[in-house]
Amino acid sequence: MYSFMGGGLFCAWVGTILLVVAMATDHWMQYRLSGSFAHQGLWRYCLGNKCYLQTDSIAYWNATRAFMILSALCAISGIIMGIMAFAHQPTFSRISRPFSAGIMFFSSTLFVVLALAIYTGVTVSFLGRRFGDWRFSWSYILGWVAVLMTFFAGIFYMCAYRVHECRRLSTPR
């Protein structure tokens, strides 16, 4: 059980760090505009060497930002639940802590997939046509790696829950 929780905590830490880095950086998309290099993220865009805040309140920007923030919050709360499960803190005695941590990581995975799907759909259908020479960049890719890490953290915690439940049911009372 502890090896599953240790693997879950490792994946959770890495996934959460990747989520925060992907959300905070401005290299989701790179393109050429009027012959100069430009890139943009969720919060700002840069033309040449000068960066500007994204002040437009466009629905897909707001949805992507909101889902990324929700994903990071779920991942952080999953880490807290995972640490409590690892340390056997008796805070929630009626609720399985590994199961709760697994659910939080699966929720985090769902939210980041929704954010990346919205961003991908709008970028490919609208912005991709607007800018001829464009590509997704490393911040966007970190978001997809964070999907894998939070998903595997959820898998590890569900396995830890299953091992714990099998041991609990097999011991005589």
Swiss-Prot record:
Keywords: Cataract, Disease variant, Disulfide bond, Eye lens protein, Glycoprotein, Membrane, Phosphoprotein, Transmembrane, Transmembrane helix. This is Lens fiber membrane intrinsic protein. Residues 1-3, 88-98, 162-173 are cytoplasmic. The modification Phosphoserine is found at S170. It comes from the Eukaryota. The lineage of its organism: Eukaryota, Metazoa, Chordata, Craniata, Vertebrata. It is a multi-pass membrane protein. Present in the thicker 16-17 nm junctions of mammalian lens fiber cells, where it may contribute to cell junctional organization. Acts as a receptor for calmodulin. May play an important role in both lens development and cataractogenesis. Residues 25-66, 120-140 are extracellular. The modification Phosphothreonine is found at T171. InterPro entries: LMIP (IPR003935), PMP-22/EMP/MP20-like (IPR050579), PMP22/EMP/MP20/Claudin (IPR004031), PMP22_EMP_MP20 (IPR004032). It is found in: Membrane. GO terms for biological process: cell-cell junction assembly; lens development in camera-type eye. PROSITE patterns: PMP22_2 (PS01222). Glycans are attached at W43, W61, N62. Belongs to the PMP-22/EMP/MP20 family. Its main location: membrane. It comes from Homo sapiens (Human).
